[in-house]
């Protein structure tokens, strides 16, 4: 085991769970962290240490001044509740409209989940489409990658809005009879170490292939090692999370 100590920003020390490789836990008092709070892990390993965003963080935001990414607690007092409980897509035929949330507007700026829901969905429905395929929206540090250099796999990109606003977009699409396909990226990940998984706990190959198979030449990114049970668990859990939560 490379990681020797893990804590939440020096404040709350985590402890390794006996007989559970790679599993660390911490018990916090009620109210210790609340909705909107920023947090990171501080990981110490043999020969070094670093602040890391938890791999399972479901909300990540970027400071407008420093440009630093941090995980954020997302537990709103009144979370969004889906109005359309059951949805069955019409597939005869399935007419798919591929879209990018940030580019789906006419001004020179990044669009939002709310703008897409209010302005674009009605036009898509009017054009006769019954399905949208949303290009990659998992959190990514570089907007120019179109979302394909993912750093936080469980977090919808905060540059487009909040998780609840994405839920409302999807719910609205379903109520309009429009199915939603999400383009998730599990073939590779961004190289970034501070924001991503590139060197999460002192082992640059924790999630990825070693040697010549590690880097994706076309994307300048890292390739997941599908031969590791922990990696498969991480990626399949990610699929389940998006299906269950959104």
Q: For each predicted feature, which ranges?
A:
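Short, small-residue-biased leader/transition segments that mark boundaries at the very start
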Residues: 3-8
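Short, surface-exposed loop motifs enriched in S/T, G, D/E and P with embedded aromatic residues
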Residues: 11-19
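Substrate-binding/active-site clefts of carbohydrate-active enzymes
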Residues: 61, 79, 83-91, 100-246
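The feature marks proteins involved in alpha-glucan
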Residues: 18-98, 103-108, 115
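Short structured motifs
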Residues: 10-11, 83
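Residue-level signal for beta-strand positions within conserved beta-sheet cores that form or flank
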Residues: 10, 37, 149
């Amino acid at each position: 085991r490379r990681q020797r100590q893990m804590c939440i920003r020096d404040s709350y020390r985590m402890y390794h769970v006996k007989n559970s490789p790679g599993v660390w836990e911490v018990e916090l008092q009620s109210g210790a962290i609340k909705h909107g709070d920023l947090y990171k892990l501080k990981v110490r390993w043999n020969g070094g240490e670093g602040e890391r965003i938890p791999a399972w963080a479901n909300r990540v935001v970027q400071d407008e001044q420093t440009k630093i990414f941090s995980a954020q607690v997302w537990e709103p007092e009144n979370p969004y509740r889906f109005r359309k409980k059951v949805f069955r897509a019409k597939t005869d035929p399935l007419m798919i409209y591929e879209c990018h949330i940030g580019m789906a507007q006419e001004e020179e700026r990044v669009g939002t989940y709310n703008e897409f829901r209010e302005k674009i969905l009605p036009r898509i429905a009017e054009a006769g489409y019954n399905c949208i395929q949303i290009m990659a929206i998992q959190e990514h540090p570089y907007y120019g990658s179109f979302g394909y250099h993912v750093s936080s796999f469980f977090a919808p990109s905060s540059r487009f809005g909040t998780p609840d606003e994405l839920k409302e977009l999807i719910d609205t699409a379903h109520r309009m009879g429009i199915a939603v396909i999400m383009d998730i990226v599990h073939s590779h990940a961004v190289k970034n170490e501070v924001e991503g998984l590139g060197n999460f706990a002192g082992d640059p190959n924790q999630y990825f292939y070693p040697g010549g198979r590690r880097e994706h030449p076309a994307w300048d990114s890292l390739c997941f090692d599908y031969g590791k049970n922990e990696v498969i668990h991480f990626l399949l859990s990610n699929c389940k999370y998006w299906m269950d939560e959104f």
